[in-house]
A protein has these predicted regions:
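N-terminal interaction/assembly modules
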Residues: 1-86, 134-141
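Hydrophobic positions on the alpha-helical face of helix-turn-helix-like DNA-binding modules
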Residues: 95-96, 109-111
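Short, conserved sequence motifs enriched in acidic/basic residues, glycine, and aromatics
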Residues: 86-87, 115
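Short amphipathic alpha helix immediately N-terminal
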Residues: 87-104
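N-terminal positioning helix adjacent to the helix-turn-helix/winged-helix DNA-binding module
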Residues: 76-79, 90-92, 124
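Amphipathic alpha-helical binding modules
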Residues: 105-108, 114
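DNA-recognition helix of helix-turn-helix
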Residues: 114-135
Length: 141
């Protein structure tokens, strides 16, 4: 795994949480949008598992998955923060934090850190990843 991939795990875990949140909202909508159809015909009622039961079962599963994903996310963030905090150069720590932990765009990072153009921030990012790799693996190259 490259150093960049190591940091991208944070964003991947965030995407998983957003997906689970969307599923949770779907089950909430299912549970709250229950309508009963009365036709007057015998046997016209719904058979089997109701929408409420389906929504409740789905919601319980999603909440369990969300709990596990938040725990995983927290662990990944702590690992990334630990690695970043050990990088000697402050500007590289800031750049990696803004990009991978805060999720800032390249143009926002460039503005925030005073880089004159995107190429400068890309170049600094490359150097920051090299420094992170040195720290992670305890190497000078």
């Amino acid at each position: 795994m490259t150093t960049k991939d190591y940091f991208l795990r944070v964003r991947a875990a965030e995407r998983e949480i957003r997906l689970l949140d969307a599923k949770k909202r779907h089950y909430e909508d299912m549970g709250f949008s229950i309508t009963t159809k009365l036709t007057g015909m015998p046997g016209s009622g719904q058979r089997g598992v109701s929408k409420v039961e389906t929504a409740a079962i789905g919601m319980a599963d999603i909440l369990s998955d969300l709990k596990h994903q938040y725990e995983r996310y927290s662990k990944i963030v702590k690992e990334a923060e630990n690695l970043i905090s050990r990088i000697p150069q402050g500007k590289y720590r800031q750049l990696l934090t803004l990009r991978y932990l805060v999720g800032m765009s390249w143009s926002s990072i460039s503005d925030e850190m005073g880089y004159k153009d995107r190429n400068s921030v890309y170049r600094a990012h490359g150097y920051a990843l090299l420094e992170a790799k040195k720290v992670k693996y305890g190497k000078e190259n």
